[in-house]
Amino acid sequence: LDQFSNPDNPLAHYEGTGPEIWRDTRGGITHFVSSMGTTGTIMGTSRYLKEVNPAIEIVGVTPTEGSSIPGIRRWPEEYLPGIFEASRVDHTLDVSQQDAEQTALALASREGIFCGISSGGAVAAALELSEQVDDAVIVVIICDRGDRYLSTGIFPD
């Protein structure tokens, strides 16, 4: 499968995720936020969104130095996934492991969204972005499930 180099990975998001976001926001999206693991989601969705509106800001989420957030990586230049194109990301926001875990817990307890740590990181970045911009329509991808993290202790009994 090799989702880090498989062109079908971003293609699925170019053909599916991007058009769905555009349709569901009625073209109102101003910012797209996505964690950067394989980078397939952000690559394919960015490609589609920039084709329909180049003004949409694409924001990648990376862990702060020293943080370990499953599913989100801080890629050294020499190890970037084969599908990654830097020109498709306008900028990145760093998120700490603690913020990612706390946001995942808050989403579960307050909103009933049982997501994983990488999704917590993406939502934390989107919330940070929302404090920096006015009148924005920010779309963030929740890409993992919380059941994969039950053994980590971030979700209390």
Spans of model-derived segments:
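Phosphate-binding loop/pocket of nucleotide- and phosphate-handling active sites
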Residues: L127-D157
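Hydrophobic/aromatic beta-strand patches that form the interior of the parallel beta-sheet core
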Residues: L1, V33, V59, H91-L93, ...
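Active-site/ligand-binding loops adjacent to catalytic centers
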Residues: K50-I117, Q132, G153-D157
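Alpha-helix C-terminal capping segments
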Residues: G44-V52, A124-D134
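Glycine-rich cofactor phosphate-binding loops and adjacent beta1-alpha1 units
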Residues: E20-V61
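Short glycine/serine/threonine-rich phosphate/pyrophosphate-binding segments
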Residues: S35-T45, S118-A126, Y149
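Glycine-rich beta-alpha junction loops
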Residues: S5-D8, G37-G40, T62-S67, P76, ...
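Active-site/ligand-binding-proximal alpha/beta "capping" segment
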Residues: D2-M36, Q98-F114
